[in-house]
């Protein structure tokens, strides 16, 4: 397998460009401002008991009475000690929220289009069109972060499926 440093350099610059686009679009986050996300405000109330327990006991509670009359906390941000995928996810989402989700949208769709053997210039345009599609921006505004997170990873999942069926185990 021959490594093409020019192509790697181009893709690296594109990824840097996507990070820059995400930061520029959400530039108020650089000043510490945050979007008022109604669902996140509601989450804060539901997760208060869990967060108080974590702070007081330095341990996790996997049950809360603060949501729906009692429920497991896995949907409210319970932390698990050996969740290495979460650590990888946090490394990929190095930008402040919500710019991190926009970056994931752009990166994931760019990779999908490259896997589909689309020219990188067209892939850039496709990624920008996908990332800035109306719905994907709207869900960030109301706090549907878990949905945005799942949608952002779907192009990468599809890329992996396509590569597996093509028996191409490396990009």
Regions found by a protein language model. Give the residues of each.
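Membrane-interface transmembrane helices that cradle and orient dolichyl/undecaprenyl
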Residues: 157-171
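Transmembrane-helix signature of polytopic, membrane-embedded enzymes
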Residues: 113-132, 170
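Start-transfer (signal-anchor) and selected internal transmembrane alpha helices
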Residues: 1-25
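Membrane-interface coil-to-helix junctions
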Residues: 22-112, 128-155
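Membrane-water interface at transmembrane helix exits
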Residues: 26, 113-114, 162, 166
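Juxtamembrane/transmembrane-helix boundary motifs in multi-pass membrane proteins
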Residues: 2-10, 89-97, 118, 142, ...
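Residue-level signature of transmembrane alpha-helical entry/exit and packing/kink sites
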Residues: 7-15, 98, 102, 123
